[in-house]
């Protein structure tokens, strides 16, 4: 093995540095075998006699050369091994870099662009060949047009040359513009969707917040201006606006304000420090830089971002659904007001001059923005009676509200039929049953006792009317479906109730009497669960291991409520016993 490595590494090189040229024979790597053959040069009789001398120095020199050769072989082998290790490491690093580069660069997009460039190249080549053919055809026709009369041929040649020059000049001047109007097939580009990433979701929410910050600041300043947050600023703005509308300068005033804003933005982009707002008292909130977060804190951050996105999408959906329902006559009495207003505006535009209409609209907008809205915001009862836009907007329903109204109407019809005795068995009052899931959804708070088979007086405490979403971990059970269950935890005056979200009946719900609880304490299950894995452990005589209500986002609030009610009930029981 050593000799094969030696042949690969030092092929064709002389090992002159291992054996002395004078005292050792010449040998090459290609001649290396099991034994080192000695090449005997032609010597004289005297030299032969010296070599035959057993006490001569040649044998000692040869032995030292062989030892030196063996030692350098091991050093050389170690060197080759080191180079191989370095090469393997470099190969690994280069493979990692190549993989990262392939992930960062979009190969499909580059291939599409390359295909487009190839198509353009073929089109250009086709155009060049067409132009060359036309030129050859023109030259052929010119040669054929030469007749016996030289005068007529010369005139035709001049005319064709002139036409060709005019055509070439026209193509050079306007050919590019003509090519722009050439119809081409529409290109269908497929955008690659990015995979779901918690980091990208958080970054997009921050980008959205930064992008909407100028708009939100502008709306806040306008609201402060309408609320007379700064009396002097609002008074000056009101006087300037009304004067501009009265003299017909409203549009030039808004254009001048837009130019002023762009000029200030230009100075800010150039490095000037300008903090300018409509109302000086309204200050911007500064975001503190966040430090390195742990895994649980990052998970909590993702939950917060998801909650913000959910609320934002919900508000946007409410606005769009209200606008749709306004125009689709879902609430006829509200759409009727808009309908009458549009007819009045149409009739006024037909009989009055646009200058008069613009003056009236501008004066009404100024009075409404600076005076009427200020009074309505200070007097809510007056606003609920006379503010027509506010009444229309708040009265418009969203699609979920319409669905709830439909379900409530159908449930009332069922209750009416039940009260008349037309149905032998139906769902209990205030409860609408979903047949697909087999679960009773309560429509009134009084049906809470029916879910857990409790007295009607048992209702959730005010601090937990909606309950706390969590998962029940019953360590006494071995089946996965019984070991952990998702649901909602409630606390009443005397019971701790857990409603399973996937229960087909009340058998999977859990009801624990507060007086039966022997111990209650905070418990941390797993850091990757929501709420940093925080939970509450409850010990009872009927369970060998404590029941754990884990994955609670608001664990501290729930623990304080449950523990205070537990202490209250146990103290009342001990006092009654004594």
From Swiss-Prot:
Annotated spans, Disordered: 132-157
Compositional bias per record (Polar residues), positions renumbered to this chain: 139-154
GO terms of biological process kind: apoptotic process; negative regulation of toll-like receptor 9 signaling pathway
Native source organism of the sequence: Xenopus laevis
Keyword flag rRNA-binding: no
Coiled-coil ranges per UniProt: 83-135
Protein's cellular compartments: Mitochondrion membrane; Endoplasmic reticulum membrane
Record membrane topology: Multi-pass membrane protein
A Pfam match: GRAM
Protein name: GRAM domain-containing protein 4
């Amino acid at each position: 093995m050593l000799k094969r490595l030696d042949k690969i590494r030092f092929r064709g090189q002389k090992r002159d540095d291992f054996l002395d040229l004078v005292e050792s024979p010449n040998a090459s790597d290609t001649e290396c075998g099991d034994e080192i053959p000695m090449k005997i040069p032609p010597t004289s009789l005297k030299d032969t006699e010296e070599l035959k001398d057993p006490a001569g120095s040649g044998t000692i020199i040869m032995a030292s050369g062989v030892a030196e050769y063996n030692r350098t072989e091991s050093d050389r082998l170690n060197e080759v091994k080191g180079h191989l290790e370095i090469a393997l490491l470099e190969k690994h690093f280069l493979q990692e870099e190549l993989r990262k580069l392939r992930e960062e660069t979009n190969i499909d997009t580059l291939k599409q662009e390359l295909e487009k460039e190839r198509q353009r190249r073929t089109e250009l080549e086709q155009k060049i060949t067409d132009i060359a053919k036309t030129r050859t055809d023109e030259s052929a026709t010119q040669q054929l047009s030469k007749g016996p009369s030289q005068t007529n041929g010369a005139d035709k040649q001049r005319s064709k040359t002139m036409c060709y020059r005019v055509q070439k000049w026209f193509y050079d001047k306007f050919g590019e513009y003509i090519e722009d109007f050439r119809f081409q097939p529409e290109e269908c580009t497929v955008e690659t969707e990015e995979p779901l990433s918690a980091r990208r979701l958080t970054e997009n929410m921050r980008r959205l917040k930064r992008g909407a910050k100028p708009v939100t600041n502008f709306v806040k300043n306008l609201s402060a201006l309408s609320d007379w947050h700064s009396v002097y600023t609002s008074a000056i703005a009101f006087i300037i606006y009304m004067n501009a509308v009265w003299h017909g300068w409203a549009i030039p005033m808004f254009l001048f304000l837009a130019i002023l804003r762009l000029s200030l933005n230009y100075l800010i982009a150039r490095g000037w420090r300008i903090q300018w707002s409509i109302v000086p008292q309204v200050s911007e909130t500064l975001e503190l830089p966040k430090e390195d977060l742990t895994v649980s804190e990052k998970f909590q951050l993702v939950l917060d971002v998801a909650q913000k996105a959910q609320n934002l999408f919900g508000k946007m959906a409410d606005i769009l659904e209200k606008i749709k329902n306004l125009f689709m006559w879902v609430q006829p009495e509200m759409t009727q007001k808009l309908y009458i207003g549009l007819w009045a505006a149409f009739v006024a535009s037909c009989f009055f001059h646009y200058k008069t209409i613009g003056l009236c609209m501008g004066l009404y907008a100024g009075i409404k923005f600076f005076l009427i809205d200020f009074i309505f915001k200070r007097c809510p009862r007056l606003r609920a009676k006379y503010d027509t836009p506010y009444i229309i907007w708040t009265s418009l329903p969203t699609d979920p509200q319409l669905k709830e109204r439909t379900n409530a109407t159908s449930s009332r019809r069922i209750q009416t039929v039940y009260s008349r005795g037309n149905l032998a068995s139906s769902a209990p009052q205030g409860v609408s049953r979903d047949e697909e899931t087999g679960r009773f959804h309560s429509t009134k708070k009084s049906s809470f006792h029916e879910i857990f088979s409790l007295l009607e007086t048992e209702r959730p405490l005010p601090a937990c009317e909606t309950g706390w979403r969590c998962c029940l971990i019953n360590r006494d059970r071995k089946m996965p479906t019984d070991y952990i269950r998702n649901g909602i935890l409630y606390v009443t005056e005397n019971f701790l109730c857990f409603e399973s979200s996937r229960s087909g009946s009340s058998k999977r719900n859990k009801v624990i009497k507060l007086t039966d609880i022997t111990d209650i304490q905070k418990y941390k299950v797993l850091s990757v669960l929501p709420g940093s894995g925080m939970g509450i452990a409850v010990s009872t005589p009927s369970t060998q291991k404590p029941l754990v209500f884990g994955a609670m986002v608001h664990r501290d609030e729930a623990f304080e409520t449950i523990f205070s009610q537990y202490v209250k009930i146990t103290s009342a029981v001990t006092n009654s016993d004594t």
